[in-house]
């Protein structure tokens, strides 16, 4: 296909498909039709900036429809037709557009797409991209502008930047530093043990988490005098675990990060700080409390074949005045952003509905997203049957998928 002189796109709130078309087709000129509503959402600015900054697009970008004196509402037939007869007609003449342009009718209101497509003497062909949930291959349907007869397909590249997809919706993207413990060679085996321990009543086979976690969790939730700096957890508090084996196990945990002696062992037991204000202390507590589960899920996704460019962790998506929450895991598969909220367990203060609300809050105004809760089996096991049924019903009503992560095979429901 020869280079396209002029490519028109009707911007909407969901523009990933059109963005990918621009990258693959490389038209000389991209013309963004921007209604007043879309301009108010700032979608045109994000689209233009992302395309210009992609380093893959080399054409020019033009905008029409939102400027003062030539605004397009795009919802009523008479208003659209009047705009087409005046503003659009003048615009095409100024840009020497005559039977040398392509209109992508994927976005916008149906009536706007229909009336634009009906303009004679402008279009070489029409393009349409269906939302292809079940296909790894993304393609564009080509249509004759008058008869609407199919003219073939254009297969798009499977290479696409997840960050670019996010930039179409977020005004700013911040990357939070990952927990450095995940780089330690012992962290993954310990994460596997932590996962296994959720279904264990007593320590066995060198896995002492069933003895350690209740003691740590009790210490972390207890109130202490303001002037107290440290806590001593004596060996007998860890129940049936033998002190010599317990020391070796706790040393492994302590050595996951340089704690500079603030968490240490002595002849009486384990010494912990009361406060975890310092970064390394906070990283250690966070990993033991839940970051281990994120590390495990990330590893399983990679083992299931998810590519680096399809996967992001720890992003904060800022939209307007909303600072947004940090996302656990983000995927891009089959032309769709997938927001994953992970939960290793629920604290006594948490409710089953909390992760549901969190994944909705993270993904608001982010286009046609897929929302997924990846939960450790212990969450379902600990819930009352009626409570769990109600939770499943609420998730289904909000089109949120639940994955009980019993193993890496369970995560294939996310990528198949």
Where are these regions (language model features)?
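N-terminal beta-strand-loop-alpha-helix module at the start
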Residues: 1-50
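Short Gly/Thr/Asp-enriched flexible loops that form oxyanion-binding sites at enzyme active sites
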Residues: 108-123, 388-391
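Structural motif
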Residues: 9-13, 34-37, 105-107, 316, ...
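Short, acidic/small-residue loops that bind anionic groups at enzyme active sites
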Residues: 101-102, 120-143
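A broadly used, surface-exposed interaction patch
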Residues: 29-102
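Beta-rich, aromatic/charged-enriched effector core domains that present basic-aromatic interfaces
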Residues: 107, 133, 137-180
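Hydrophobic beta-strand segments of well-ordered beta-sheets in folded domains
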Residues: 3-9, 25-33, 59-63, 100-103, ...
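Intrinsically disordered, low-complexity Ser/Thr/Pro/Gly-rich regulatory segments
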Residues: 165-416
